Amino acid sequence: MDETKTPTRDEIPETDKWDLSHLFSSADKWSEDFAWIQSTYPRLTTWKGRAGESVRTLAELLEFDKALDLKIERVSHYASLQLAEDSANPDYLSRMGQLQNLFTKIGETASFIVPEIQAIDDESFARFLDDPALKKWRTRLQKIRRLKPHVLSEKEERLLALGSSALDGYDDTFSQLTDVDMKFGVLLDEKGEERPLTQSSFGAFLVKRDHGLRKSAFHKFYDEFKDHQFTLAATLSYSVKADVFRARARNYNSALEASLFKDDIPVAVYDGLIAAVRANLAPLHRYYELRRRVLGLEELHAYDTYVPLVAEIETDVSFDQAMEKVLASLAPLGGEYVDSLGKGLRGRWCDRYESKGKRSGAFSSGSYGAPPYILMNYKRDVFSDVYTLAHEAGHSMHTWLAQRTQLYQEADYPIFLAEVASTFNEELLTHYLLEQTNDSKMRAYIINRQIDDIRGTLFRQTMFAEFEKVIHALEESGAALTLEVFKTEYRKLLAAYFGSGVMLDPELELECLRIPHFYNAFYVYKYSTGVSAAIALAERVLSGVPGAVEAYLGFLKSGGTKFPLETLQAAGVDMRTSAPVESTLRLFERRLNELEDLL
């Protein structure tokens, strides 16, 4: 096989592909389950108008809905994994299209379940919860019930549903404008060859060692945003207005409170994150000064903050070697964890290598009762792919242990917890790799990587989180959200987080208009809390705190049985305090000290 060309799927050895037979032994078996779902889901209407009739009736409805969901999850998982391995395969595209049409119909048919559970009177609901027949559904029923104060009348809910497309349209407008309509042109790379500048390639230009190329990419990229800045300000403004409207319509005190309510996160946790990071910006500013000095620049600009301080190290690590490094790094978690992961990786949980039509990047996904699967595009000369494997393995083991321990209805964990397990694995890998090498260049590379990870997930995402809070508060106060308001508020944050050692080009103010996550408000703070919780948990395990390993494994196994803060507290980390964030900030400063000594 010519290694300079991307192989076709058929050219990849079977042992290097994931084994989807755990889901379905054949496409025909998938079709059988799909047909069963098609013929069975209409039976949901048998319970319409009757959910609160009796304990027995509600239990029957929940069990039937569960049986349906298990089938739906599995057929969906199989189809999505096949499409990920070859996005051009017409059979795979057809299956996914069939599913999407069916899901719409099922969603409409099942839409009565939650409102009817919320409509059960308080006395009857309390009696239902105490009945042994509903014991295994208690957590789910309580989570549904706690939303009751924020659910409106049937007529009002219908009006909100009818308006949802209009309220959500700003996200689509933003995506179409930035991904399709905006054209960024081409740049001459370091070899003098023309390269397209796009949303996806912009980041690749910023890590180039050629300062002039980074500068050109930055200005050319933001010139296009400047041409559309008023439109982008309008779409963001109306997205914020939609958030505030929904929060007020559902009787929340603020859009922030509305977003945090589902996971039972107090606003004080969000505010505490911002306060803790704000109070510890000095080491970040020191890091930028180190960057300026090491890169040999008279002044540092934002486009100089992504290029690695240590040039990409030459490496040749096979997938099997990467797997062994990851497994060795996870030894502190004990045999149950390491043996299960090793057996899974050797047993074709992972689709290892790039092939034509395969989805780029990496992910982990699972469905109840089957192994989790990992998509990789592993390259033996890209050292960061070892980290990617550790990261995705963390997600997979979280899913694996939760599903093997909990009932279906309690196994799924929220996004707030999802990044904890994956980042935890990266922390253990970093610790292991630093223990295994005395090579100063390799140590500097690993430490610089960890510093930049913390910078990107804790400092940068907290800055974004603060911006979201500011602009929603302005809207709630009645202030107009204009282009100048967005740029002014964002520049204040840039000045605080970058410090006086970074030259702030005027174009950088436009960065606030290009962040897709701002159209899914108050999401990004979860990256900051996730990395903080992961580092705090990893430090407990690595320092040998009694019971830390058992507590961490208990966290992985708990799934969605409790709300996120309770789950993490049981594992030994209290996110209601600033301690985990401050622990991560101290690690950042320790690593910075080490990097300064090495460089």
What are these regions (language model features)?
Residues 385-388, 399-423:
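Post-HEXXH active-site segment of zinc metalloproteases
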Residues 315-317, 369, 373-390:
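Short pre-active-site segment immediately N-terminal to the catalytic Zn-binding motif
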Residues 328, 332-339, 365, 395, ...:
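Conserved helix-loop functional segments at active or binding sites
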Residues 10-14, 21, 25, 113-118, ...:
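C-terminal, non-catalytic "cap/extension" segments appended to globular domains
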Residues 294-338, 372, 398, 445, ...:
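Long, K/E/R/D-enriched contiguous segments that form extended
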Residues 373-377, 405-415, 444-453, 472-474, ...:
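Short beta-alpha connecting loops at secondary-structure transitions
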Residues 315-317, 350-370:
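Catalytic zinc-binding patch centered on the HExxH motif and its immediate surroundings
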Residues 1-312, 323, 598:
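A well-structured
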